[in-house]
């Protein structure tokens, strides 16, 4: 029997990842698609859909992109499936998740600016039908495990009210991997692990990556393969704080940079969690009729161990390092496997693609910005997508050298925006930190980093690149091709005319966890008017006793440091 790297068989059994009969050679495979794979058969329809989303995993942080981080499961799944090498996501958490579940650009959900913060009376628009709701209509059982980060101020915003039959995970964007505490400012700390619509106090102490993989396996064990399943696993990994079980840290003990060492350990732990989920798919009879999709949610945070090398930029930016995603599809149902696809794709495309796979339908009335790209993925056909609106953020419009005049009277180039049309990519305003940063493998002083190349400060607000010829964004062609600049600025203006107002309300003190028994959760009543959202009101509800003041203080400064490094995120 093969050795299980990082997990002993006993630990896997104790955590519930394996049952004893999994230890038999007939069920333990070297990896997905290898020994132990079930024989091919005509699959029933519709397929089971397993969507795995990772958090802050950089473009370079997977083995098949030449990383120094071990990801054998992801490498094997991708090698036997279809690698998506022209696939785009959003630069930060909430926007990617909202576009995945609605199939709409940020300008069409009102979530153009930043993320949904824990104390904001904001959530995924309640009038929009989500992907899991469409799949429920098609007869699917829908389950979510992991990070939500799409708002929770009202109960109607919760995952179980937005299309998921079950939910286990966190509602906010950043929690401790063991205690599930999250601080959103000095003294504004609370517990954030929920099962359904209840606080899951009893699960505290379990490392989230292992807990979420265990729950995903349990869902598979208790579900009939005869009923179509949608399983959305949104790992917290590898977002900060950088925490990992000790056994994973040990294998990277020679890595000089402490942040990179911890980050690498977290990635490898997540890789093995994916392996356990894949085993469960085979063990319980789902695999032959399953489509497994793997995607990152945004670029890696280079100041916290991540790497997007050789792409330019990082998380929170509109350079390629912030928006080009890690992605692949693995499935016995693919007609052309073991290949790389360079068809243009975007995270909004999963909505119509998966609804189509499920036997459902979409129409122009749905207002989708995504396309059905299954023929491009499965058969290698051309993508129906020819352009991507990365975003228009009208609230971030203070680029010093931008102006309407600088945009030929077509577009105010002080506004942060980015668009891809064909092979051309245009950025305006302030795209964010734009250096090329190699993996941080060398030892550094705390809070510092090193660059192979550093861009000098430039006085401009418009950039143009031929991404097909220059994927690393080294040669700005804005001065040489004003005709293309004009065309793309006009396209931005066209998109902007369809945008709805930005929804970014002020934080509400009523959201404080102390008014909710010590946990983050819904605080607004269903009947409240929007103008009341943001008013400060005092509550007299009982407070949860603070168990560890120094822990909360450390958590706050850890989050504060991350925010400072992330610039606006």
Curated annotation (Swiss-Prot):
Principal location: secreted
Compartments, as annotated in UniProt: Secreted; Endoplasmic reticulum
Cofactor(s) needed by this chain: Ca(2+)
Tissue specificity: Expressed in placenta, in embryonic stem cells, fetal eyes and lens.
Annotated positions of the 3-oxoalanine (Cys) modification: 93
Textual note on the cofactor: Binds 1 Ca(2+) ion per subunit.
InterPro entries linked to this entry: Alkaline_phosphatase_core_sf, ARSB, Sulfatase_CS, Sulfatase_N
Pfam families for the chain: Sulfatase
Protein's job: Displays arylsulfatase activity at neutral pH, when co-expressed with SUMF1; arylsulfatase activity is measured in the secretion medium of retinal cell line, but no activity is recorded when measured in cell extracts. Lacks arylsulfatase activity.
Name this protein carries in UniProt: Arylsulfatase I
Organism per entry: Homo sapiens
Gene (name only): ARSI
């Amino acid at each position: 029997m093969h050795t299980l790297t990082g997990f002993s068989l006993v630990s896997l059994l104790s955590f519930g990842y394996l049952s004893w009969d999994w230890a038999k050679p007939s069920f333990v495979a070297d990896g997905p698609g290898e020994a132990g794979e079930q024989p091919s058969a005509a699959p029933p329809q519709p397929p089971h859909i397993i969507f795995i989303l990772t958090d802050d995993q950089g473009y370079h942080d997977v083995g098949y992109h030449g990383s120094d981080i071990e990801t054998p499961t992801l490498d094997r799944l991708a090698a036997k499936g279809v690698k998506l090498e022209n696939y785009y996501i959003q630069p930060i958490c909430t926007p990617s998740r909202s576009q995945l579940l609605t199939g709409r650009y940020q300008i069409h959900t009102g979530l153009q600016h930043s993320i949904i913060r824990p104390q904001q009376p904001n959530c995924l628009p309640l009038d929009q039908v989500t992907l899991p709701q469409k799949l429920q209509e098609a007869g699917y059982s829908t389950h979510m495990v992991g990070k939500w980060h799409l708002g929770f101020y009202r109960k109607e915003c919760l995952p179980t009210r937005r299309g998921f039959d079950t939910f286990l995970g966190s509602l906010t964007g950043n929690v401790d991997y063991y205690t599930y505490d999250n601080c959103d400012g000095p003294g504004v700390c609370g517990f954030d692990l929920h099962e359904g619509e209840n606080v899951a106090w009893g699960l505290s102490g379990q490392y989230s990556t292992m807990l979420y993989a265990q729950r995903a396996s349990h869902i598979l064990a208790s579900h009939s393969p005869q009923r179509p399943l949608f399983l959305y696993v949104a790992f917290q990994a590898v977002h900060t704080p950088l925490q990992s079980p000790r056994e994973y840290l040990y294998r990277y003990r020679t890595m000089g940079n402490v942040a990179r060492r911890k980050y690498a350990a977290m990635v490898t732990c997540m890789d093995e969690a994916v392996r356990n989920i894949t085993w469960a798919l085979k063990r319980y009879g789902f695999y032959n009729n399953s489509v497994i999709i793997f995607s990152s949610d945004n670029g890696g945070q280079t100041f916290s161990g991540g790497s997007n090398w050789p792409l330019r930029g990082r998380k929170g930016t509109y350079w390629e390092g912030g928006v080009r995603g890690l992605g692949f599809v693995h499935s016995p149902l693919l007609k052309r496997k073991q290949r790389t696809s360079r068809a243009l794709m975007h995270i909004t495309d999963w909505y119509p693609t998966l609804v189509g796979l499920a036997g459902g339908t979409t129409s122009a009335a749905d207002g989708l910005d995504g396309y059905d790209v299954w023929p491009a993925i499965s058969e290698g056909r051309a993508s129906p997508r020819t352009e991507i609106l990365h975003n228009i953020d009208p609230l971030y419009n203070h680029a010093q050298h931008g102006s309407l005049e600088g945009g030929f009277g077509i577009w105010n180039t002080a506004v942060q925006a980015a668009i891809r049309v064909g092979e051309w990519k245009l950025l305006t305003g302030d795209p964010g930190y734009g250096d090329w940063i190699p993996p941080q493998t060398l030892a550094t002083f705390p809070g510092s980093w090193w660059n192979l190349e550093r861009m000098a400060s430039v006085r401009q607000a418009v950039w143009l690149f031929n991404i097909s010829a220059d994927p690393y964004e080294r040669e700005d062609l804005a001065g040489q091709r004003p005709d293309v600049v004009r065309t793309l600025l006009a396209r931005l203006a066209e998109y902007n005319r369809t945008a709805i107002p930005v929804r970014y309300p002020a934080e509400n003190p009523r959201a404080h966890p102390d008014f909710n028994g010590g946990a983050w959760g819904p605080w607004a009543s269903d009947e409240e008017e929007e103008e009341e959202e943001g008013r400060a009101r005092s509550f007299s509800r009982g407070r949860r006793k603070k168990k560890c003041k120094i822990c909360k203080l450390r958590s706050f400064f850890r989050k504060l440091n991350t925010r400072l490094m992330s610039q606006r995120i």
